[in-house]
Curated annotation (Swiss-Prot):
It is found in: Cell inner membrane. HAMAP family: UPF0161_YidD. It is a peripheral membrane protein. NCBIfam families: membrane protein insertion efficiency factor YidD. Keywords: Cell inner membrane, Cell membrane, Membrane. This is Putative membrane protein insertion efficiency factor. Its main location: membrane. It holds the Pfam family YidD. It comes from the Bacteria. InterPro entries: Membr_insert_effic_factor_YidD. Could be involved in insertion of integral membrane proteins into the membrane.
Length: 79
């Protein structure tokens, strides 16, 4: 239930809010796609933590690049 709600909120952000701003994500996949994938793969708690950590790294001083969601087998959240 909570997972479905969170995924819906992220999708609503992508449809309603994201188009109002110019594209600025430094990463591939984008931060919103990363959040969707992270919650889908890791669940609400860990997926949200991974997404928040990614969003905090999405700024002009970080080089960005390809940064996929880690595999569930990787025990720790890493940068």
């Amino acid at each position: 239930m909570m997972k479905k709600l969170l995924l819906t909120l992220i999708k609503l952000y992508r449809i309603l809010i994201s188009p109002l701003f110019p594209p600025s994500c430094r990463f591939q996949p984008t931060c919103s796609q990363y959040a969707l994938d992270a919650v889908e793969i890791h669940g609400v708690w860990r997926g949200s933590c991974l997404a928040l950590k990614r969003i905090l790294r999405c700024h002009p001083l970080h080089p960005g690049g390809y940064d996929p969601v880690p595999n569930p087998e990787q025990g720790k959240i890493s940068s």
